[in-house]
């Protein structure tokens, strides 16, 4: 079911020939057709050393891309796969071990409630919204087999740990989940929107006064996808503090 072997199991350092064989297996998995969820070629039995582990991690991160909810269909993760995705969040950095974030699963049986909230939020923002626009807002609640709301708490635990750190932790937790979903062969996306701040949505999800709805996480089988976007080079977003010349571009 996995696109690449997972979890990783580091073993003894590989021989040059073993490394080449494993690299070919990762390349083959990365080149699989869009939406393919077949089992990847088996990795060599003998070795999976540090170099191979890094290559597999790189292949996983580089294969993750945003697949809009309208491009995600059934089947979604089964119970065991969803549990693995959710458990991945627990491995995020968390200063003070506050666990300042949580996730609310929105099953199919509750999508109508969310659709009603989306429609109401639109009408509150735009009293002149057309029936077609209202229906489009409602329809968003039914996309993707798995839908989760990410929630962050600005006050839980140590008050000296500010919101910025809590948001970083939540972002890392979400990225862990997206990477696990990618490793399982699923597509995923984060979505937001003005409805996240609506009183009706806060009431539906019973958010506390110090909590905010961060984003929705959608997961499912890729039905269609756009081409992968070109990622920026590290040199475009990294600079170096030089003791004599100040901040210099690159690293």
Which positions does each model-derived feature cover?
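A glycine-rich helix N-cap at a beta->alpha junction
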Residues: 138-140, 204-230
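Helix-biased detector of long, well-ordered alpha-helical tracts
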Residues: 68, 154-159, 242-251
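A structural motif
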Residues: 143-149
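N-terminal amphipathic, basic helical "cap/leader" segment at the start of enzyme domains
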Residues: 2-143, 250-251
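Phosphate/diphosphate-binding glycine-rich loops and adjacent basic-rich segments that engage nucleotide
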Residues: 227-251
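Small-aliphatic-rich amphipathic alpha-helix that forms the alpha element of a beta-alpha
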Residues: 89, 148, 154-203
